[in-house]
Amino acid sequence: MPARTGFRLPRRGLLFLAVPDGAVSEMATRIAQMKPPPALGIVHLSGALGLDALSALEGNPRGSFHPLQSFPMPRDPSAFQGITVAVDATTPSLMRRLRALARAVGAKPRHVGDEQRVLYHAAAVYASNFVDVVVAEAVRLLRGTGWTEEEATRALLPLVEGAVANIRRRGPVEALTGPIRRGDAETVTRHLRALDRPDLYRMLALVALEIAEKAGLDPAAAGRTKRALTRDVAATRRRGRR
């Protein structure tokens, strides 16, 4: 239901609150003032909010139903095929209904309770929003060398898709490639010196180094790479004080 008044509440079934996160509690309060029938289950679609966002409706079964998928625009129902849907509910009956709904659209239900919600949603941001951020930064770098945005995006997307395919086949640790995985400190140093905004690279590289060590990177090579990353930080700070 949209964030508006003038609607009539159904006597039973499920009412989904398809509103921004910041409007969920307000909408719950407005619905509570309408005295909803006790048989009506009320469900929000937020990935970040727990069931406490619906606390104004404590007389009703309350739930959450969050598809772990990106919806920047209307998408075909096939977008639900094989994805995970995070579900939670205040009653076993509503939980069963939400699980059944997830399966009906081709998804896999997974219980995610209030205590897990914040980290669950942060993980979703990493796997979706931050991928876009990193690709946008890569496009920006290529544009700085004379590429158009279209050329850069077209060239980079197969690389992104290949990385995702490797993760699907081998998992995130074994799929890591590149200079960090090889412990190529010299290349890392050249990158840092060339970048106009090296902090993002440095932050991601340090996390990548942890993954590379799990994948079996030689400790000596890992040490050289870490020194290259941290030494550049110290040099940058010294230049800034001059």
Region locations from a protein language model:
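Internal alpha-helical scaffold of NAD(P)-dependent oxidoreductase catalytic cores
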Residues: M1, G59, D76-R169
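Rossmann-like NAD(P)(H) cofactor-binding subdomain of soluble oxidoreductases
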Residues: P2-D76
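Short alpha-helical
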Residues: G22-A23, L49, P92-S93, V133, ...
